[in-house]
Amino acid sequence: MYQILKKQTLNANTKLMVIEAPHVARKAEPGQFIILRVSAEGERIPLTIADFDREKGSVTIIFQEVGATTMALGALNEGDCLHDFVGPLGKASELEGLKKVAVVGGGLGCAIAYPQAKKLHEMGAEVDLIAGFRNKDIIILEDEMKNACTNLHIVTDDGSNGRKALVTQVLKELIDAGNQYDAVIAIGPMIMMKFVCETTRPYGIKTIVSMNTIMVDGTGMCGGCRLTVGGETKFACVDGPDFDGHLVDFDSAMRRGAMYKAQERAAVERRAEHCNLFKKEVK
């Protein structure tokens, strides 16, 4: 069993948890992920590793409570235990040799962009970190991101914090200003990553994206995480999750990502009905 050592609310529906998982922490690297189950009857969900501490034997995860399983996870408290916490899975991000990098995070993707930027910064690279959010109320890890980069650019859709702009606008301006990046790393909603790739394509800048796809087993057997990269079928869990963004077929990936929306809504509704029934019974 994997104990929750720390639980922190980052915004209205985003939680941070530090999990006791020494075997995972020992080998974890930025870009990798874990698969967890809240209970023996629960579904398996993949979450990218947000941070890790080898000495303490802990792994940090950050998640939004958007589905039945993440809601169940968010309802747990410090001292509670998870049934499964498997990892690290996937290939670690290839960051060696990069001297100047733009890291672009969108929304919850900033939780994954942060360890990438942190590792690069620790390696001595110059890092421009561009973080985009809908509004000031959902900004996460601002102080942590400031300490993990050379320059932090926060943008919001409504201008309530930082500049009112899209992450692609800031990225293009930085490139046009003469910044010669060895690579751009983009992590966030697929539509955002798609347009980051379209922004960098004319400049020929290597652009890496982290593909958060449907996933069940994390070993490539289920085929749920398949996507098309350079005209070939790849599996995010074993071939990724990092890929050359200029080769990814984002349109097909987004269609696959929406396949189970109806089932996800039904699961949330069932959970809400169960919770309401339980409240009535205990009164």
What is the predicted function of each stretch?
Residues 112, 190-191, 212-242, 273-277:
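Local cysteine-cluster metal-coordination motifs and their immediate loop/turn environment
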